[in-house]
Amino acid sequence: MNDSEFHRLADQLWLTIEERLDDWDGDSDIDCEINGGVLTITFENGSKIIINRQEPLHQVWLATRQGGYHFDLKGDEWICDRSGETFWDLLEQAATQQAGETVSFR
């Protein structure tokens, strides 16, 4: 994968997250902001999830209250380089815990 392909795929990921949160109809307030390649999700309780891209490594990094995760693209899925879990699974687990209600991005 070259840098432009990596940015296209990361942009696609950011857009999906932003669209899902724009359509969010849950009870808690969840905000999303993109600034300089960093996507920040802020929850009503003040907690945050930070997602950023690591261009030199062609990785997407996810920082939550539970910990930090690094994802490599394998086929058509972003996969954690330690646990083997998908990006969407870990993001939904963290968002659900931090929002206090079920959050789905798929």
UniProtKB/Swiss-Prot annotation:
The keyword ATP-binding does not apply. NCBIfam families: FeS_CyaY. Gene3D superfamilies: Frataxin/CyaY. GO terms for biological process: iron-sulfur cluster assembly. Involved in iron-sulfur (Fe-S) cluster assembly. May act as a regulator of Fe-S biogenesis. Keywords: Iron, Metal-binding. It comes from Escherichia coli O7:K1 (strain IAI39 / ExPEC). PROSITE patterns: FRATAXIN_1 (PS01344), FRATAXIN_2 (PS50810). One of its GO terms (cellular component) is cytosol. Belongs to the frataxin family. This is Iron-sulfur cluster assembly protein CyaY. One of its GO terms (molecular function) is ferrous iron binding. CDD domains: Frataxin. It comes from the Bacteria. InterPro entries: CyaY (IPR047584), Frataxin/CyaY (IPR002908), Frataxin/CyaY_sf (IPR036524), Frataxin_CS (IPR020895). The gene is cyaY.
